[in-house]
Curated annotation (Swiss-Prot):
InterPro entries: Adenovirus_Pll_hexon_C (IPR016108), Adenovirus_Pll_hexon_N (IPR016107), Adenovirus_Pll_hexon_sub2 (IPR044942), Adenovirus_Pll_hexon_sub3 (IPR016110), ADV_hexon (IPR037542), VP_dsDNA_II (IPR016112). It comes from Snake adenovirus serotype 1. Homotrimer. Interacts with the capsid vertex protein; this interaction binds the peripentonal hexons to the neighboring penton base. Interacts with the hexon-linking protein; this interaction tethers the hexons surrounding the penton to those situated in the central plate of the facet. Interacts with the hexon-interlacing protein; this interaction lashes the hexons together. Interacts with host dyneins DYNC1LI1 and DYNC1I2; this interaction might be involved in intracellular microtubule-dependent transport of incoming viral capsid. HAMAP family: ADV_CAPSH. GO terms for biological process: microtubule-dependent intracellular transport of viral material towards nucleus; symbiont entry into host cell. Keywords: Capsid protein, Cytoplasmic inwards viral transport, Host nucleus, Host-virus interaction, Late protein, Microtubular inwards viral transport, Phosphoprotein, T=25 icosahedral capsid protein, Virion, Virus entry into host cell. This is Hexon protein. It holds the Pfam family Adeno_hexon_C.
């Protein structure tokens, strides 16, 4: 029997559909005290979640390119898009399906530390020979022993060695404890690396040799024996070693100190995740030049894509996505794992470490004399009457005297110090680093080899730096915090590609250009092509921002297909919709999400002012300004498929929104060619002049806010621009925004001594000349601070002389409070709207008549913190960036672009 289909519909039947009207009214009247509606539910209801409805059904087809062009700089794919009758194409859900191969280059290292002998001491050698002068020194540990009487030559000859025997993992039996081997009656057995081995000899930590067979042997030549004698007996053999000829390798490490082959120290290469950029930024080429993408009908061949160099296609997509959904979820779609950083690295909350009972290390056996094996003897039988003692037969005694020997280390302090060294010190500006002696680094400062080999000065950051404070290192405030191995978004995107240098990729890339990504395309035949960059610095992102082109990364596209979604409709429905959309009154209208014209104004190194002049123009429909600061080295020429001067692969704030220099602005003035003040006289400060932050330790009028040096005036301006909260700015915003102001505003303060002749600034003296080592702290328990912090400790225990105490009974009385703030991921905003405080007489545009109906020139002047490298002022002018799309005939499409007040244009086919 066929089931009654009416009981199996998707949504479930409503009681109103089949109950009598009187019963429905009764249920509604009594439901507040007795809900009887549940009594009338259908016994069979299909699920309403996890099912496919007619609203979600689409037909997705693959379109293969008709023409491709593959050269050194880009890959171009041209598609013929046929939209048949009874079909509508949703270009908003279309995407490019790309297959290819990726060589992430030798600088790719997706982990910290090393994979090879990570438990070995930093300077410990492997069993190997090394040359000192004219002598060959053999350094080896021989853990296996055998009986060897007299000269031991016969026994040594009898020892059987092979490619894998003796195994370097074998040694003394379990539970044997520390044993002093008598080399006159016993001999040792082990393995040693041959002097003839190829490659650079390396410490045991991070040393590697490739296996030759499945047995694990590493020798590339037949095994020979090496004999040694460490006794005073002439002609004796006290050790036998199997000699391996190997190919020395150190895949993930480098030298940090080198004297000779037997005296060197290694460190693991720095982590360097490499993956596609967030939302595949940079892979698709957006520009108004000859290499722009195109969408045209086959009848007239006129491109309807009008992109401009001052449009923000990539950044608009970032902002749109952030407002549509959470940037911290759904990472698998479109590769949109957002760039982030560890706030505890950017802003160090140095609350010290947690103390407890001492951390002690004990001998494995537990019973031992201090730094020597337990004493060996026998049990004794004591005659109390005669007061004599004699050895008890068949007994052995192993005795340690005194307390169990132990060594102590402050494990929490060491863990804290390791965190600060690996996460902060290693990312210091290059000015605060040095090249270890006898270490050769590449001349190119942008290469991974150079960045990897430089070491930080020890005293810049330590466990006592700004202790007790929440403060960012001043020298780190202008360092890109997103270029860090704790960027979880980049790490995720790198891991999506796997953990190997060479990988295959299969990715889906969305269209971001605002006129195409929303378009509903009517029946016809169209040409659609786009350019895909191959420059690894633009397409890929790395942790350290090294020059991936220089370091050998390569991208190869093997296949680019287009997937488009067709709405399956019946003939009548499709025909009706098509007729409506063909009508000019039903044009499709789209806005660029960010709606801004961007301009870059160069700020030379050391300069603290930048002036912007805009000639006469009408300012109708103008919405205001957004601005921040970018480094020249981190900003590519987006008008080129490959910028040869762009030698950097970290985040690109210009495209991805990872702004981090907004805190470097001091003030901004805005002047029109008119005496009418703007934006009015009811602001805290002088009209037309915005003070963003006060100089350090200066706030005579009390304008600062939230324990920082940000002014109340500019705080209110940002609250008005971001959340429509002007003088009500001291209230919680109604929403959170990934790129919002208060979400990213980080105030901080600290106390510091007032330095004078009595209280000298030892840190300044150290930075002036590290060789003087003026700071005494942890003396004897670490390497001296004029050299490499990774070497063994030296010196002796002594009193500390730094930092000055700021708390407790001995607190320095003469202290001053320093305040500052950071506001990353954010563009400063100054709105130009009647809603912003007072704009005078309003028009229907909501703006002052003077600016809406006549032309005026504009002068803006910014005062910024000077930096030691050239930067840009990124200034966004808020415009209405619109496109109107009309498809009057089959295969006919016309597009009109409107950008007020800055530009307009049109394209039609």
């Amino acid at each position: 029997m066929e089931p009654q289909r009416e009981f199996f519909h998707i949504a479930g039947r409503s009681a109103k559909e089949y109950l009598s009207e009187n019963l429905v009214q009764f249920i509604q009247a009594t439901q507040n005290y007795f809900n009887i509606g549940e009594k009338f539910r259908d016994p069979y209801v299909a699920p309403s979640a996890g099912v496919t409805t007619d609203r979600s059904q689409k037909l997705q087809l693959r379109v293969v390119p008709m023409q491709i062009e593959d050269n050194a700089n880009y890959y171009k794919a041209r598609f013929t898009l046929n939209v048949g009758d009874n079909r509508l194409v949703d270009l908003g859900s279309s995407y490019f399906d790309i297959k290819g191969t990726l060589d992430r280059g030798p600088s790719f290292k997706p982990y910290g530390g090393t994979a090879y002998n990570p438990l070995a001491p930093k300077s410990a050698p492997v069993n190997s020979p090394f040359i000192v002068g004219n002598d060959t020194h053999v350094v080896a540990q021989l853990p296996q022993t055998y009986a060897a009487a007299n000269t031991g030559v016969t026994e040594a000859i009898q020892q059987q060695v092979s490619n894998v025997q003796p195994n370097p993992q074998d040694g003394l039996p379990n539970y044997s404890g520390p044993e002093v081997v008598d080399a006159t009656t016993k001999a040792g057995l082990g393995r040693v690396v041959a002097e003839e081995s190829e490659g650079q000899q390396f410490p045991c930590l991070r040393a590697y040799a490739a296996p030759q067979t499945a047995a694990g042997d590493v020798s590339t030549a037949p095994i020979e024996k090496t004999y040694v004698n460490t006794t005073n007996v002439a002609g004796r053999v006290s050790g036998t070693m199997a000699t391996d000829v190997i190919d020395w390798q150190n895949p993930d490490a480098h030298f940090v100190d080198y004297v000779d082959d037997g005296r060197s120290t290694s460190a693991g290469n720095r982590p360097n995740y490499i993956g596609f950029r967030d939302n595949f930024i940079g892979i698709m080429y957006y520009n108004s030049g000859s290499n722009t993408g195109s969408l045209s009908s086959q009848t007239q061949q006129l491109n309807v894509v009008l992109d401009l160099n001052d449009r923000n296609s990539e950044l608009s997509y970032q902002y749109m996505l952030a407002d549509l959904t959470s940037r911290w979820h759904y990472f698998a779609l479109w590769n949109q794992a957002v760039d982030s950083y560890d706030r505890h690295v950017r802003i160090i909350e140095n609350d010290g470490y947690e103390e407890g009972p001492p951390n002690l290390s004990f001998p494995i056996q537990g019973i031992q004399n201090p730094f020597s094996p337990s004493s060996v003897g026998t049990e004794m039988t004591v005659n109390t009457a005669n007061q004599t003692a004699a050895a008890t037969a068949n007994t052995v005694a192993h005795i340690g005297y005194g307390n169990i020997p132990a060594v102590e280390m402050n494990l929490p302090a060491n863990l804290r110090r390791t965190f600060l060294y690996a996460n902060v010190a290693m990312y210091l500006p290059d000015t605060y680093k040095f090249t270890p002696p006898n270490i050769d680094l590449p001349a190119n400062h942008l290469s991974y080899g150079y960045m990897n080999g430089r070491l930080p000065l020890p005293n810049i950051i330590d466990t006592w730096t700004d202790i007790g404070a929440r403060w960012s290192l001043d020298v780190m405030d202008t360092v890109n915090p997103f270029n860090h191995h704790r960027n979880t978004g980049l790490k995720y995107r790198s891991q999506l590609l796997g953990n190997g240098r060479h990988c295959n990729f299969h990715i889906q890339v969305p269209q971001k250009f605002f006129a195409i990504k929303n378009l509903l395309l009517l029946p016809g035949t169209y040409n659609y092509e786009w350019y895909f960059r191959k420059d690894p610095n633009m397409v890929l992102q790395s942790t350290l921002g090294n020059d991936l082109r220089e370091d050998g990364a390569q991208i190869t596209y093997n296949q680019v297909n287009l997937y488009v979604s067709f709405f399956p409709m019946n003939y009548d429905t499709q025909s009706e919709l098509e007729l409506m959309l063909r009508n000019a009154t039903n044009d499709q209208n789209f806005s660029d999400y960010l709606g801004a014209v961007n301009n870059l104004y160069q700020i030379p190194a050391g300069s603290n002012t930048v002036v912007v002049n805009i000639p006469d123009r009408s300012w109708g429909a103008f919405r205001g300004w957004s601005f921040t600061r970018l480094k020249v080295t981190e900003t590519p020429r987006i008008g080129a498929t490959q910028d040869p001067n762009f030698e950097y692969s970290g985040t690109i704030p210009y495209l991805d929104g990872t702004f981090y220099l907004s805190h470097t602005f001091q003030r901004c003035s805005i002047q029109w060619d008119s005496s009418v003040p703007w934006p009015g006289n009811d602001r805290l400060l002088v009209p037309n002049w915005f003070e963003i932050k006060d100089p350090p330790n200066q706030d005579p009028e009390g304008y600062n806010t939230m324990q920082s040096n940000l002014t109340k005036d500019f705080f209110f301006t940002q609250m008005a621009a971001s959340y429509n909260q002007g003088y009500q700015g001291f209230s919680y915003p109604s929403c959170t925004k990934h790129y919002g102001f208060i979400n990213n505003f980080e105030p901080m303060s600290r106390q510091v001594p007032v330095y004078d002749a009595t209280h000298p600034n030892l840190m300044a003296a150290y930075l002036n000349n590290p060789a003087t080592m003026p700071i005494w702290n942890n003396c004897g328990f670490q390497q001296k601070t004029s050299t490499n912090a990774l070497l063994e400790r030296c010196g002796h225990a002594y009193v500390a002389n730094w930092p000055f105490p700021l708390t407790g009974r001995d607190a320095l009385p003469n202290q001053t409070t320093e305040k500052k703030f950071l506001v990353d991921n954010y563009l400063w905003q100054i709105p130009f709207s009647s809603n912003f405080l007072n704009m005078g007489t309003l028009t229907d545009l909501g703006q002052n008549v003077m600016y809406a109906n006549s032309s005026h020139s504009l002068n803006m002047q910014f005062t910024v913190d000077p930096m030691n490298e050239p930067t840009y002022l990124l200034l966004l002018f808020g415009v209405f960036d619109q496109v109107v799309v009309n498809q009057p005939t089959r295969s006919g499409i016309s597009v009109a672009y409107l950008r007020l007040p800055f530009a307009s244009g049109s394209a039609a086919t």
